[in-house]
Amino acid sequence: MQFTALLAALGAPLALAASIPAAAHNHTMIDVQLAATGNSMIKATITNTGDRTLNLLKFNTIMDEHPTRKVMVYQDGAEVQFTGMLPRYKMSDLTPEYFVNLGPKASVEHSFDLAATHDLSRGGKITVKAHGMVPTAEENATTITGHTLYESNELTMDVDGKQAAAVEQAMGGDDSTGVIDKRSNIVTSSCRGSQLRVLQTALSNASRLSRAAASAAQRNPSKMREYFKTADKPHRPEGASRFLSVARESSSGSTGRTTYYCNDNRGGCHPGVLAYTLPSRNQVFNCPSYYQLPALNNRCHGQDQATTTLHELTHNPAVVTPFCEDLGYGYQRVSALPASKAIQNADTYSLFANAIYLGC
């Protein structure tokens, strides 16, 4: 779609940061209320509190229908491990089914089982909350023009661990790997046709872009301020270090700490998903739409194979610690994140690397 105490201290949201400066197009216009409807079942009621219709993009939000990170779950002050998926969605050519159209004062409900994406086998009291931002389009349109913030109530639940453990994990499946390529541990047996060559090229390009970005993070304070919202220490060396870690992981000389699949074997390649990561397993899966992207985009902030791979590698705790989340997609949303969130946002790294490569 999921952590360490540092992320908990930062109050990392599931989708986009709640501490974004208010503007006419991004103030709070929806209310989210969480309610327990079973041992580990949650019902989220999303209400449009404004006076105009909202067209809400579901990707990586409380309304996402896939096993993504919708809420933060805490037990005894620590985050409960997230076992779901962190996808990168294709943000161009959006279609109406990716949106929820919500009229003024209207509500929509979305239910999900926490035990399908979290390890709740310990049982006991947990605290659940959600906050973030939803990209918005005009009514009956699919072009993103703004965003709206939300923050839910804090919900306390007493979970039966045995019942929770009996819930099937949404992203469970066979962990067998087959033939492994040294570079980022590519499972070559998962590749068909030219896919292995395409992925190897993407990893090579991701390494090259990451090394250039690492250098720029140290030497180009204006770009750091543009994307990471600060050029102060410790952000510059931290950003550079993370880029170098991605570069090492994606280079041909790496022994590989992640396992990379050319194709999906866990059912996570839903419509709109380019690739996804299971951070609890340090596994990355490409989807069919990944292979429709250009190897490298010649458009500033455009999506491509190299930066999608870079994006996904930042989701893996074996590469980046604490690993990055999906707190903001696209240049406008990334630009709205404060420094504490930008450093933890996967798309910040892919957009920065793209900007350095193209001289944006």
Swiss-Prot record:
Top-rank taxon: Eukaryota
Q: Where is the active site?
A: E312
Q: Which GO terms describe its cellular component?
A: extracellular region
**Principal subcellular localisation of the protein:** secreted
Instruction: Report the record's Gene Ontology biological process terms.
Output: proteolysis
Entry EC number(s): 3.4.24.39
Q: Which GO terms describe its molecular function?
A: metal ion binding; metalloendopeptidase activity
Q: Where in the cell is it found?
A: Secreted
Where is carbohydrate linked to this protein?
Answer: N205
Tagged with keyword Zinc? yes
Q: Which cysteines are cross-linked by disulfides?
A: C191-C262, C269-C287, C300-C360
What top-tier enzyme class does this entry carry?
Answer: hydrolase
Asked if Signal is a keyword of the record, the answer is: yes
Residues annotated as binding Zn(2+): H311, H315, D326
Q: What exactly does this protein do?
A: Probable secreted metalloprotease that shows high activities on basic nuclear substrates such as histone and protamine. May be involved in virulence.
What's the protein name?
Answer: Probable neutral protease 2 homolog A
Lineage of this protein's species? Eukaryota, Fungi, Dikarya, Ascomycota, Pezizomycotina
Task: Name the gene that codes for it.
Answer: NpII-A
